[in-house]
């Protein structure tokens, strides 16, 4: 699994952090997404896919 986040698209909603807190965080100053783990373990793949699906700005791309 490869994860790409587009910080220019991110609106700071935080949905990704709620769905996969071990993989995503937000910058303190503006809430923009930060990718914590570029290659998460298989146990987190479903949560990462969910985060990408629910992102209101479509700022997260996941490829296998």
UniProtKB/Swiss-Prot annotation:
Any one GO MF term held by the record is:
iron ion binding
Q: Which InterPro entries match?
A: 3Fe4S_ferredoxin (IPR001080), 4Fe4S_Fe-S-bd (IPR017896), Fe-S_cluster_ET (IPR051269)
Report the cofactors. Answer: [3Fe-4S] cluster
Q: Which domain of life is it from?
A: Bacteria
The protein's matches in Pfam families, at most eight in alphabetical order, are given as: Fer4_13 (PF13370)
Residues involved in [3Fe-4S] cluster binding: 10, 16, 55
Q: In this protein, which residues make up the domain named 4Fe-4S ferredoxin-type?
A: 2-29
Matching Gene3D superfamilies: 3.30.70.20
Keywords carried by this UniProt record? 3Fe-4S, Electron transport, Iron, Iron-sulfur, Metal-binding, Transport
- Cofactor: how and how many bound: Binds 1 [3Fe-4S] cluster.
Give the induction annotation: By herbicides.
User: What role does it play?
Assistant: Electron transport protein for the cytochrome P-450-SU2 system.
The protein's name in its UniProt record:
Ferredoxin-2
Organism in which the protein naturally occurs: Streptomyces griseolus
